[in-house]
């Protein structure tokens, strides 16, 4: 694992989601089988491809690089090393009898495969100076951040997951999305240590928002987060991302990765309002047993009734049922 991670960190195309720790996370938190492939020559790793198998009667059977992650796909020192791993992955997909093999990348890895460009990512360099970062936010959004600052909000690094889980689960329930388990977030903290951090926002001692972020090289990735019902009135979510930007800059971070969003959604518009430019993501598919590309996303009309029902669930019930569903939504 140390050699794998050293290779990932040394490659410019390496991401947090290529790290070997995801093997432990996916197996321990969800019980999914992992297949982390690598190519070695003369004792040196030349290519890696993290893969995990997600199998469910309701949502199908897939082999993905990497489930629950926005990025993945192969990393290689040369195209022929990459192609060798892709050949191994397609053979594995056939042996496992999956519906499809999926690669999630920031550039095309298998040009002959069908590709979906449903998602974009938002990444932007930040300054070491907080005032410069504030000035870089477009005027209208900057005014919203200032309202949060004036609302008496307070940010702090959280050592536990309870306050985060309450804010996060409230938010995703309201969106109609099944929540992940507490265990998943505990495992993330245990596996990634200081590279996985929670920032919680309070107002008069009450939690209003919280975000779990990943740190990789000089990058910060706010990945899971949300706010309570009180968050909207005091602009807690806007303040939260601003506070994270300040905190990350203090840690020497120079790239703020706002993560992926689906084109045409509210999250997409929110990130554009911060002055971030969308960059395309390429999700490529090799069909094995499947006859069509998968369409497992909230914009699919097939899931509209389920989403509407989920939004009306009591919070405690969504927290109990959610993990049984979300483990297959990788």
Walk through the language-model features, giving the residues of each.
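Short intrinsically disordered coil segments
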Residues: 66, 135-144, 297-304
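Aromatic (often tryptophan-rich) hydrophobic motifs at membrane interfaces
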Residues: 37-48, 58, 69, 77-92, ...
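Active-site/acyl-donor-binding loops of N-acyltransferases
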Residues: 36, 49, 53, 107-132, ...
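Short secondary-structure capping/junction motifs at helix and strand boundaries
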Residues: 83, 93-105
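Residues forming anionic-ligand binding surfaces in small-molecule and nucleic-acid pockets
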Residues: 62-70, 118
